[in-house]
């Protein structure tokens, strides 16, 4: 059985679309999935990147693109009333949903659809209260243990080379983005390309012009 780690932050529409599509992509592949919350802003800060929403033309394109992608894969998607927003309460709620701080698929679905279905404000206090009641956390989402776990998840993701969400890890390989799902499927079902030299070769340092 394959072990898959799915790194996510609900602020990302691509994480939502990838989550919704994952069962179809991995149908027939024996696997167990761990959904691991990470703070995308922390990843971006570490790697010196800006998020798509921080570059206005890129933000516009990204939102148009994800709506088209959602239509193509038959997934309901509505841009939340406020975006970007502070995802920390949702990330912590995901961790607090179980004693081992591993949210299950039901929790993930509730969390991501809270943001990406309906077009409401994901940070609205009344909506957050209703979501918390639905998920029924067994730990305190605002407690120090949950906060520390999120920091550790984000730091360990950086150490694993995660630079964005969604990212999927399996068999020591890291796959990034919604469009990497077919590649992930190929890797998890014994695709022969992964037996060749290209994966290792393209991970080697190369010379190149450095921006000053």
Predicted segments, located by residue:
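Asp-based phosphoryl-transfer active-site loop
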Residues: 4-10
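C-terminal cap of thioredoxin/glutaredoxin-like
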Residues: 5, 17-31, 110-212
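Structural alpha/beta surface segment adjacent to cysteine/selenocysteine redox centers
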Residues: 10, 16-115, 198-212
């Amino acid at each position: 059985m394959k072990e898959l780690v799915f790194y996510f932050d609900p602020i990302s529409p691509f994480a939502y679309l990838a989550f919704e599509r994952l069962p179809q992509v991995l149908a027939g592949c024996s696997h167990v999935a761990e959904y691991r919350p990470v703070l995308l802003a922390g990843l971006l800060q570490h790697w010196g990147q800006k998020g798509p929403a921080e570059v206005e033309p890129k933000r516009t394109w990204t939102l148009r693109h994800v709506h088209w992608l959602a239509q193509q894969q038959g997934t309901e998607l509505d841009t939340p009333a406020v975006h970007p927003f502070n995802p920390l309460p949702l990330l912590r709620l995901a961790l607090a949903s179980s004693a081992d701080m591993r949210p299950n698929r039901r929790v993930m679905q509730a969390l991501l659809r809270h943001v990406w279905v309906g077009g409401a404000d994901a940070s609205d206090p009344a909506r957050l209260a209703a979501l918390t009641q639905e998920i029924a956390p067994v730990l305190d989402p605002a407690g120090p243990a949950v906060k520390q776990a999120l920091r550790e998840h984000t730091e360990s993701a950086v150490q694993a080379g995660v630079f964005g969400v969604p990212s999927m890890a399996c068999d020591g390989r890291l796959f990034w983005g919604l469009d990497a799902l077919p590649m992930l499927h190929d890797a998890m079902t014994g695709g022969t390309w992964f037996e060749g030299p290209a994966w290792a070769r393209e991970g080697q340092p190369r010379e190149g012009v450095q921006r000053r």
